A protein has these predicted regions:
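Compositionally biased, intrinsically disordered linkers/stalks adjacent to structured regions
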Residues: 96-97, 101-128
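Surface-exposed short loop/turn segments
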Residues: 29-85, 95-106
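Solvent-exposed, acidic/flexible segments
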Residues: 8-20, 64, 68, 105-116
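A structural "domain/chain start" motif
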Residues: 1-21, 25, 54, 88-92, ...
Length: 128
């Protein structure tokens, strides 16, 4: 789905940027706190499984008939010293067609932010 649609490129760049910003800030904060609760290096490899974002023009003209927007990513978390996979959570988030229509596409455009926030919260809940 991702590779077959060249229109996804811009959305991939946006998602990567937001995800990198949120996780980099989180990990930097943990490093600067001096906490030795965990040691070692965690490798985070996000893999986009599906991305479909209805554009603002389409959403305004067609409304809910344009369908829903959705993002599905896998986050493979690997211990760098052992190479063992620690976890591989899947994050799925969608913006319903009616929500997109009523918000004039705002819920579609915010989907990248929602997914990055869920990923950040996953680390806070499981690795702090």
């Amino acid at each position: 789905d991702v590779k077959n649609n060249p229109g996804n490129t811009a959305d991939l760049v946006v998602l990567e940027k937001i995800l990198t910003q949120k996780l980099t800030r989180l990990f930097a904060g943990w490093s600067s706190s001096g906490s030795q609760i965990r040691s070692g290096t965690l490798i985070v490899q996000p893999k986009i499984i599906k991305i479909r974002i209805v554009g603002p023009f389409t959403r305004i003209v067609v409304g809910s008939l344009a369908g829903q927007s959705s993002i599905v990513i896998d986050l493979m978390l690997t211990d760098s010293s052992t190479g063992g996979v620690i976890a591989n959570p899947r994050i799925k988030k969608n913006s319903g067609a009616w929500a997109g229509g009523w918000s004039f596409g705002l819920s579609d455009r915010n989907l990248h932010e929602y997914v990055a926030h869920i990923a950040r919260q996953y680390f806070i809940n499981n690795y702090r």
